[in-house]
């Protein structure tokens, strides 16, 4: 139920004000919002698509009517490029290509995270909730084999089911966070100064957001694991309907083993908050390392304009990739427990991940999170928490490949334009 990437590329960072980064020896000026007469207090600036408009390190998109000062890599205005001397400045056509290519890089990353990776998410969730399975699919080879079987017996729709509901859950999560922060003093972002009170309020906002999105996440989970063989042609808003019905106790009848929503609050919020914290920390560390590495390379030798443009875009994407990978791997056992608790008692029929051409019912009787953990450990062993882990390997291998291909295409375009 968390977004596939943390909000913003500053992790727990603060976008406003002036930030001093010792790695670059100078302040980075954030975007200016203008005077209160130009923009109302209710207007907020949406986050930039990664790599779309940030032309240099630390530079954010300028607001309407406010000119932006050209940033420098060092404090001296006479030496915009490290090592002395002035590098070639891109012309208007080069700048347009720079913006267009950066926007394309961001869209390619978002497309990979939310569309191309969806079959891996479907298989991963089906393996996690299948307590009958004898094959755990810990490697990508067995996952590819079962993907082929599902596609052969049920068609391509078997691997793309529930994709619309995942976008709805992300929209509900972002919308709930914005509304709650608008009507409460809880901050959506925190400053770089470690203020325990501000961090606590920010995490409280995350907890409330995950609580609001929880019933819709549960409905989306059912759509992604329900077998296509017995699945009805549901509309794209079925996730919203089922989520509201879960809250008010209406909709599709469930069994007596269905866990009440209040018993799902703790594991759901715990998973969401831990995923956000781990992602933010990893992202911050990786981005800092890449910034220092880039800065040292600029000091050692003069770099080309093409390399400067690549250094402006890809560190954020790489940091986001590493953050998502680490958080998914670390929290995979907790995610398995969470999905089994959400799916219990919903009368869901899933595909047989051992054979690929049969269906199985979900008839678990967990009493809660602790009972679920103990039962998995006793009946399926420690590796039972990692069922379907091969899908994670395929998902992030595909993501890394798309990033590398995008970087190669972008480098070729820049070489032809310079």
Swiss-Prot record:
MF GO annotations: protein-containing complex binding
Keywords on record: Membrane, Mitochondrion, Mitochondrion outer membrane, Phosphoprotein, Repeat, Transmembrane, Transmembrane helix, Transport
InterPro entries: Mitochondrial_sb/sol_carrier, Mt_carrier_dom_sf, SLC25A46
One GO CC annotation: mitochondrial outer membrane
Solcar repeats mapped onto the chain: 96-187, 311-413
A Pfam family of this chain: Mito_carr
Residue numbers of Phosphoserine PTMs: 32, 35
Domain of life: Eukaryota
Residue span of region Disordered: 46-96
GO biological process: autophagy of mitochondrion; cerebellar Purkinje cell differentiation; cristae formation; dendrite development; establishment of localization in cell; locomotion involved in locomotory behavior; mitochondrial fission; mitochondrial membrane fission
Residue positions where Phosphothreonine is found in the record: 45
Segments crossing the lipid bilayer: 103-123, 167-187, 202-222, 258-278, 314-334, 382-402
Subcellular location: Mitochondrion outer membrane
PANTHER family named among the record's database cross-references: MITOCHONDRIAL OUTER MEMBRANE PROTEIN SLC25A46, TB1 PROTEIN-RELATED
Quaternary context: Associates with the mitochondrial contact site and cristae organizing system (MICOS) complex. May associate with the endoplasmic reticulum membrane protein complex (EMC).
Protein name: Mitochondrial outer membrane protein SLC25A46
Organism, scientific name: Mus musculus
Phylogenetic placement of the source organism: Eukaryota, Metazoa, Chordata, Craniata, Vertebrata
